[in-house]
């Protein structure tokens, strides 16, 4: 049998804990029973003005060098909702996320896109768990549901963020406003069939 060097796919070791493993097993059993069209996955990720490609081409034996801002760069946060056929409620904020800014996002951007019967799926970040967030989602006739801990593989929006960051690194935007404009342009790079593929890759049935 031939072998070759292969990039590792890394998972959190905590997934092997009995309590986490049980919750993940229950979740996976639930996945096949829910209509993917009802699922709305929301999350946030950082974007920065010092992003650059992580890989490139160089002559064998030569180091590949690149320049990025060292002391003058900004961190912003991108939030969005992934449905089976589209990205909904995209938003960028200046700086890191906190409870107040996440609630404002839910109330002002997410809730207007929700329909009765929608299931809003989130990870276990503290800002996601407030009663105010629950009540805002409930006001639209939707429900809030938390993923098992240490389970980004069960959240298809993580695939969106991975592709988005790859494209942003290639863009090398160095001001906040150019970064935000570029994010808006790149959202067109996620057509309905690709969103459906992200769902299937994470185990959420046929769409």
Which residue stretches match the model-derived regions?
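Short functional hotspots at interaction and active-site rims
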Residues: 1-207
């Amino acid at each position: 049998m031939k072998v070759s060097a292969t990039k590792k796919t890394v998972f959190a070791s905590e997934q092997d804990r009995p309590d986490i493993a049980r919750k993940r097993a229950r979740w996976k059993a639930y996945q096949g029973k829910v209509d993917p069209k009802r699922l709305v996955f929301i999350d946030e990720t950082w974007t920065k003005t010092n992003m650059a490609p992580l890989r490139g081409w160089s002559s064998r034996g030569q180091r590949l060098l690149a320049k990025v801002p060292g002391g003058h760069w900004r961190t912003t946060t991108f939030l969005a909702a992934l449905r089976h056929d589209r990205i909904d409620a995209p938003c960028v904020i200046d700086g890191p996320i906190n409870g107040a800014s996440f609630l404002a996002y839910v109330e002002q951007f997410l809730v207007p896109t929700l329909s009765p019967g929608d299931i809003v799926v989130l990870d276990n970040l503290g800002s996601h768990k407030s009663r105010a967030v629950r009540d805002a989602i409930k006001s639209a006739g939707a429900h809030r549901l938390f993923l098992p801990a240490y389970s980004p593989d069960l959240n298809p929006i993580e695939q969106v963020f991975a592709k988005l960051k790859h494209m942003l690194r290639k863009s090398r935007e160095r001001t906040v406003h150019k970064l935000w404009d570029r994010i808006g342009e790149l959202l067109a790079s996620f057509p309905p069939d690709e969103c459906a593929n992200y769902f299937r890759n994470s185990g959420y049935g046929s769409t």
